[in-house]
Amino acid sequence: MDSAPSPSSLDFELSPPVLVTMTSTSSSASDNVEGADDDANTHGIFNWRDFSSCWRVSESNLYCFSLALLIWFFASFILIENLYGPKNVWLGPSSSILVEPSSIFVKSIKVKVLDYSEPGLQLYGFYRTPALDCFVNWSESRVLSISHESYKGWPYYLNSGSLLNITYTVKPQGSAVQLVVDEGHQGVPQSVLNDPAYRYNVWSWNLIEGSGMIQLEIRKSSSYYLAVANLKSKDVEVELNIDVKAVLYDTKQSFYNCNFSNGECTFNAMSLVGNSVVVTSPAASQGVSIEDEWYIRFSYQPREIAYVIGTGVVICFMLVAIQFCNRFQCSGGEGHLTEDDSARTRLLADKDDDGSSMGSCDDSYANDDADLEEFMGNDGEASNRSRRLCAICFDVPRDCFFLPCGHSVSCYECGTTMQEADGSCPICRRKMKKVKRIYTV
């Protein structure tokens, strides 16, 4: 009676296991084992590699989400401080200034007179922008004694379309001074008057001597500072006659009026309705001197609910974008794995047709990881021989290389099959143009 074969004899009688393509195509044994582990994770019921890749996408998008949210808060802060932060404005006689805040971001406007001295200021509220079509003519004369290397100046607030006619006389004869008109009400720094490049950056610069006239047209509503500078080594006297044709806003259609009885006025903006505020100063003929001036401050109370809603909308938009990004990248990763698996199946099927390996393709998928570990566990000659075998079929030596990359990882038959199926090198993923056989002499 025949005795049962021992397990050791069965191991020698069985054919060598069929190994499939590994994800890693490195020639080292450790890289081959890692590739087999990747395949095991790919074909399991729970795809751990897809899950971990999606988690990495979510983690990176979380950083992007935090950065974008920080940028939004920073932009909101800049919007509040620059557009709707406190602003100081100087007003002279026969002036008017228009302020149009957004009813979405601004709840109310507070106008306060900082150096309250003369009455006459008026605040008007409108549903829409009033017409800029009221013309007022007024004039002033100034005699300035300017010492050497100094200047004198004063501000105006002028609306677009206003005209300035400046008639001048400089004494003594032969003396020259600079007549500068620049945007702003802070004056002209003494240090920049000697800079030749300053004249190209200022709104209007003229070197005047003797007698003459200069006409200026205002194209932007703003504060302007007029200065007369003497950079010579002797004192001069300058006579100026300034005729102003000012353009003011029409206040007849206003629905709100405040006369600054206590030095300040507050205008409550209405939501989803246009809001405009005009502050006017009295004319010089109404008991007001040409030298009278008002220094006022505009301050805004923000509408907090608008910023809260805006932040919520930004967060929702970013969450939706991140969700679409995750789905796109994860679904793209799954499709790529499926394509590689199908390519491996076709390669192994071609090898099975040649009779060089045993077992079905399904069996090889089920047992390739265990066989690979057993195969790569051998040392010495077997390990060196495995480095020279085809990384696809492990049956014949590597006898080809790919053009143009030059990698050599398979036999000529497997390389030709890869070129026909996928067409890309498994090492660098570059497109293969040719598969060249290596002949051994």
From Swiss-Prot:
Expressed in the shoot apical meristems (SAM), root tips and inflorescences, and, at low levels, in floral buds and pollen. One of its GO terms (cellular component) is plant-type vacuole membrane. Pathway: Protein modification; protein ubiquitination. It holds the Pfam family zf-C3HC4_3. GO terms for biological process: mitotic cell cycle; pollen development; protein ubiquitination. It is a multi-pass membrane protein. InterPro entries: APD1-4_M, APD1-4_N, Znf_RING, Znf_RING/FYVE/PHD. The keyword Acetylation does not apply. The keyword Signal does not apply. This is E3 ubiquitin-protein ligase APD1. It comes from Arabidopsis thaliana.
